């Protein structure tokens, strides 16, 4: 086939890769893959052993590859215990965060080795890789095998496309998301916090460097501008607006066109229909709540119910049994409030005002008109679903990007952010009442504003598919064949030229030096001559 007779948009094989990430990481990637499949592309999925279930509901996935071992139950519990203990305000808490990240990245050697074997086989080699940000071995595969890559991020990548008006480490700030309303002292504290984080991550950096050295690879410094496609599952309105290079695009919220409905047998429909102001509570499927936090949450909800701000609670809680078996939780108060709540009755679903469910159809609940509020850990999916369905949020983030999402929701005027470690039952009840009563109407106004923005942006998942095709088709003709097999003939069309220049050339520093010299030298000579002549 000649170039002139070639297809304009040929079908290709796309490999989606999700390793240590879970449903929240896989769902948006598979939704984009669904769109690509409707355009004629073949979709395959690579994951850890035991995570095949993430792709099995999707008939368009033609093949599943296992590229690593599963995480054991003990490892899983240990990991999320580390996350729960992490705290940016203490040195030990910051180290805990990077120990958890180090644990995630300990899968890199195995996934890199297995992905390398996979793509080395001509039968399995994909034409494009769409990966979760935690599957960072895919970046090495891209560099080694010249397979174009897109990486999915739940928020703007921390070290890419920095802006001077965004203080500290973006996504990990102490207080302010931008410098607009930050005092000079607060901006200084944000920069000092960066130094604290860098000091805390030194073991993590050495761990990565040694791990890569053992695999025969050098260090991979994070780029200020990517040389692969970056798909950010967020949107400006939550994220601070900033200029982005062409290879970085916001595509969120990536939402499936349909979602599970409430089963008639669950009693949820009757529960919601018989009430007008129900709060939905969910902290994700992996967060383990300590007993003291459960007591304060129940006390706060009980106070809000007693005040009439809400008339029902639906709590999605995968496994309340460890708390139920904790006699202290069941029989005593938290020592702060005077609540006499029967925790045992609540946890056993014997309080008719509060429904605890092992699994709940989250989007169906958020979409119901009786749901007036969401008490959330602010995971990536939960944040987007709350905004998309127009439900205000009491944010109680636990770790990672949840902390930034809590700040973003509050900054957008659609929620109140609370600290998971020092909140009180009274404070929780007051914040619930403040949002539900909405005396000045600003919460409702901002919720509707952001919902409309999110709805408009939710169509950008098709733009993500467009951009993947664009980069894929560009890449396969940028590299030579025949005698020039694998030789890069030209750079990717979306990469700005300054990414391939030295800092001196890109900033025109050499040009400025020459211009200054052209002016300074004649002036200097003239001054010297004038001194000689008039001496």
Curated annotation (Swiss-Prot):
Organism classification: Eukaryota, Fungi, Dikarya, Ascomycota, Pezizomycotina
Family: Belongs to the glycosyltransferase 28 family.
Pathway annotation from the record: Mycotoxin biosynthesis
Effect of residue 104 to M: Does not affect the catalytic activity and does not lead to the ability to perform O-glycosylation
PANTHER family: EG:EG0003.4 PROTEIN-RELATED, FI06409P-RELATED
Comment, domains: The transmembrane domain of is critical for its catalytic function.
Function statement: UDP-glycosyltransferase; part of the gene cluster that mediates the biosynthesis of stromemycin, a depside C-glucoside with two unsaturated C9 side chains belonging to aromatic polyketide glycosides. Acts as the tailoring enzyme responsible for 3-C-glucosylation of bininalkenylresorcylic acid produced by the combined action of the HR-PKS stmA and the NR-PKS stmB to yield stromemycin.
Protein name as it appears in the record: UDP-glycosyltransferase stmC
Provenance organism: Aspergillus ustus
PROSITE patterns (alphabetical): UDPGT
Protein encoded by which gene: stmC
Alphabetical keyword list: Glycoprotein, Glycosyltransferase, Membrane, Transferase, Transmembrane, Transmembrane helix
